Amino acid sequence: MSSSSVAFVPQGSIGQIISYMVDKNFDLHEKVDKYLLYMIGKPQSGWVSINQSPLTRGDFLYKLSHSKAPLKVVTYIPGETKELLFVQIALAFDLSYEKLMQEYANATPYVEGFLIPDTYYIPVGISEKHLVHFLLANAKKYHKDVFEKIFGEFNEAKWQKFIVIASIIQKEAANTEEMSLVSSVIYNRLKKDMKLQMDGTLNYGQYSHIKITPQRIREDTSPYNTYMYKGLPPNPVCSVSKEAIFAAIFPKQTNYLYFVKNKNGTHTFSQTYEAHLENIKN
């Protein structure tokens, strides 16, 4: 994190703050610097500017307490990909998109769907590595808290399956009210060993905003093509909202196997292929 000109100060006592900074490889003395911070003033939680030039111990501790970093706002919406988030961040903070992508790949095995859609207040001067680790730490805590609240413990394999399903729901549903219905169709088709045949699974990575055509359905041989292969895609296809996660975990109990977009921009659901064909005509 040494290339960052900012540092994050967590909530907590002075002792807890110093312990956190030591864990982040800052050269602080837990007893001596705790006493000095009592004299200088307790750091407020948030981002602080520390500059990249060498600082005396006293200057560093003073900055922790008094030098708030300027922030910029970045909004990451559900249904987007990390590539689009990192493009946005690179432009706003004059950072390297390639470095952001590389730091992400180095830090986590999760290809997509892990970072949390949210409005982030990010400090000017942060490095690519520091920023990626901040986003991942925030995401890890969020997913773990949500899963443990529902199931009592975190099971990574089960969580990954739910996030994959949630990402399909995020792409397919016209609104939050439909999410549990779309979820039911996914589970019902999986249970019957049917192909999902959903366009949203083909909106992965670079194809996030590309219209799905019959030619693409025929020619895309990736495991994301649920017209070609049974089962779920290997990874989530986009970021997911809390509502999509809950819909993936708690699908509505229906017998629906099909849905099609109607004139109102929402979807009409059906149990049989014959009814589905009629809905397509309408």
Report residues per predicted region:
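C-terminal amphipathic alpha-helical segment
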Residues: 213-249
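Conserved catalytic or metal-liganding residues and their short signature motifs at active sites
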Residues: 1-197, 201-207, 212, 238-243, ...
